[in-house]
Amino acid sequence: MSLYRDDGIVLRTQKLGEADRIVTILTRRNGRVRAVGKGVRRTKSRFGARLEPFTHVDLLLYTGRSLDVITQAETVRAYGEPLATDYPRYTSGTAMLETAERFTPMEKEPIIRQFLLLVGGLRALGEAVHDPRLVLDAYLLRTLAVAGYAPALDECAVCGTPDGAGADGAGPDGAGPDGAGPDGAGPDGAGPDRAGPDRVGAGSRSFAVPAGGLTCRSCRPPGAASPAVATIALMRALLRGDWAQADVSQARHRVECSSLVAAYVQWHLEHSIRSLRHVEHV
């Protein structure tokens, strides 16, 4: 058995025996690692609260037969502290942790870009400069991009025709609190098309999750959503990190953006992200 050192974000923990825990960590150099923290649940544990979710830790581990064992842990930054008293930020953070684990199915497969995205997302939540749901959606979109699943937002996802809808500007779209606009599209991005003049489907574009993003009129599949032009502009801004544009977006476009992003990420994961249910009810 060999010793190795790495740093990582604690994603989750689960009980093992009477005093131990299995800790799932997204590390900088070794990808996702599952390791045992011996005696963590004891009152006088030498690890204290260092192996709790949201904590960035520097670790010394040795390789075990099935699970590695944590022999030393030092806190680099406890991202959970500023989130614990802010429910919207906490729920967005838990959705990030769950997503990070879902996008790292293989253990000990280095994925430093996913690690850095998670660190940046948690830092942004803790700094409380931006709307936590915007931070979450930016994280989800960039995580998709790193994994090779970025939605097509500038051209048709099917035929590649460049998008011209973004120059039209946007007016009121009447989106309701459930993320549905006048086209009746729900969180899964599907519904009857009754697009107004400010909506993508009113010109040449719609958004279809199964197709991979925007679709032109010729490639539009049944049930495609007709989001507001400003909603697609917001998605573009979040994907490229344009916070000046994202921060001035209107609430109804943020709701619609979140619905599309949630549907898109869960489609590509082929698995629901349970934490998103709590975010949607904030």
Where are these regions (language model features)?
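Non-catalytic alpha-helical scaffolds and adjoining flexible linkers that form interface surfaces
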Residues: 1-282
